Regions:
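Soluble periplasmic/extracytoplasmic beta-strand elements of cell-envelope proteins
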Residues: 27-32, 130-136, 143-145
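Short, charged cytosolic
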Residues: 2-28
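Select subsegments of transmembrane alpha-helices in polytopic membrane proteins
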Residues: 40-51
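Flexible, solvent-exposed short loops/turns enriched in glycine
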Residues: 123, 139-174
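Cytosol-/stroma-facing membrane-proximal "stalk/adaptor" domains immediately downstream
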Residues: 161-211
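Alpha-helical transmembrane cores and adjacent cytosolic helix/loop segments
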Residues: 1-2, 6, 36-41, 66-69
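Transmembrane alpha-helices and immediately adjacent membrane-cytoplasm interface residues
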Residues: 59-98
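Membrane-cytosol interface motif
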Residues: 102-120
Length: 211
């Protein structure tokens, strides 16, 4: 996925949010995270499990070959192998997330999205019409989190379609374009159900936050 947004990207997306919100009482907020976790401990668990299974295989082979190794030496070899694996895990950027199961990566990214929804007060708009568009780049994950009033009106499959287009664009190194499209589509859905009126206060900042 694309790794960062330029200052020009930020200005363009802020203008896109402002334009989308002129048609609706809804509020759109965007957060782009580099990652949602360091994943060292899940990856370390996977490595430990791998060392354990490899040790079983080696132990079985030694037993079949009648090759004698003392218990202490065998345990020390296991410990050395695990220590070396953990050092490599620390030293190689991006290795931890590759060793972490996809389901766990997505859960961590989703949890981060919910934290950002609350941290940026998207849930505190007057009419409960806030929407968070969230992307976590390392996990290749995106989601739309909608507040209660919107959730009652907009079907989940409509958000899913927006997310699918956003993820596809980000994977193709077109993150800015994908976010702009998601903002436009979200604004269109909000305008259908929560059209702007005479009183249309801007309750959330119109910009993209990178964390």
């Amino acid at each position: 996925m694309s790794r960062s947004l330029t200052s020009q990207d930020h200005r363009a997306l802020a203008d896109r949010i402002k334009a989308a919100e002129t048609r609706t009482r809804g509020e759109i907020y965007c957060v782009v995270a580099r990652n949602s976790d360091g994943y060292f401990f899940p990856a370390a668990f996977m490595l430990a499990a791998g060392v354990f299974l490899a040790s079983l295989a080696v132990g079985f082979w030694l037993d079949r070959s009648w090759f004698v190794v003392g218990h202490l030496a065998f345990v020390l070899c296991q410990a050395a192998a695990l220590a070396a694996a953990l050092l490599v895990l620390r030293a190689v950027p991006g290795l931890a997330i590759r060793l972490t199961p996809r389901g766990l990566r997505y859960r961590r990214a989703h949890d981060n999205a919910m934290r950002q929804f609350l941290a940026h007060n998207v849930h505190l708009t007057e009419k409960r019409t806030g929407v968070l568009i969230f992307v976590s780049l390392a996990e290749r994950y995106a989601t739309v989190v909608a507040d209660a009033a919107i959730d009652d009106k907009v079907q989940q499959q409509e958000w899913d379609a927006i997310v699918a287009r956003l993820v596809a664009a980000a994977k193709a190194e077109r993150l800015t374009e994908g976010l702009a499209d998601a903002i436009d589509k979200a604004g269109g859905l909000l305008a259908q159900h929560f059209p702007g009126g005479v009183s249309n206060p801007n309750e959330l900042d119109d910009h993209v936050v990178e964390i």
